[in-house]
Design a protein with these regions (language model features):
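N-terminal extension/subdomain marker
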Residues: 1-153
């Protein structure tokens, strides 16, 4: 496998992208009000929030059973046709930062044998941000049973 390659990208067919989209799970960890507002915005609509565990919820009752709940929601979204598949692709994304600068990115398949978040291994791909290692086990548990992969779970 190449280090970075195209893959099938699933995009939501959502009519309400405001309900669908949320920021990465490792953001606003000390601001539960952000996540409460995201929950209210999503209501009962399909949402990325239903496919991830915000780190703000890690040490709350919401974390219990999250891995099973998320995997079931992923399966339901797949069965209900929530996504459209863009085969053998990359996805270009832009995010506007609070200071107005634009951060650009590419969603792709990555050979995880060539990735290191610690900065200590001689690999080709490294994390651009620090990783809080004690927050990894819940993400690993979610990925273990998940039929879909996301940049942030």
């Amino acid at each position: 496998m190449h280090i970075v390659t195209s893959t099938d990208i699933l995009l939501p067919r959502a009519e309400d992208m405001g309900a669908w989209s949320v920021i990465a799970c490792d953001q606003f960890t000390s601001e539960p009000e952000y996540w409460a507002a995201a929950e209210a915005r999503a209501a009962e609509k399909p949402s990325t929030l239903s496919l991830m565990l915000p780190e703000a919820w890690l040490h709350t009752a919401r974390a219990e059973g999250a891995d099973t709940r998320i995997a079931e929601t992923m399966r339901r979204y797949l069965a209900e046709g929530v996504f459209q598949t863009i085969p053998d692709s990359f996805a270009y994304v832009e995010r506007t930062l609070p200071d107005g600068r634009i951060r650009r990115g590419l969603v792709a398949a990555l050979d995880l044998e060539q990735y290191d978040f610690t900065g200590r291994l001689p690999v080709s791909v490294r994390s651009t941000e620090g990783t809080v290692e004690e927050r990894l086990p819940p993400r690993v548990n979610i990925r273990r049973g998940a039929p879909l992969e996301m940049p942030h779970t």
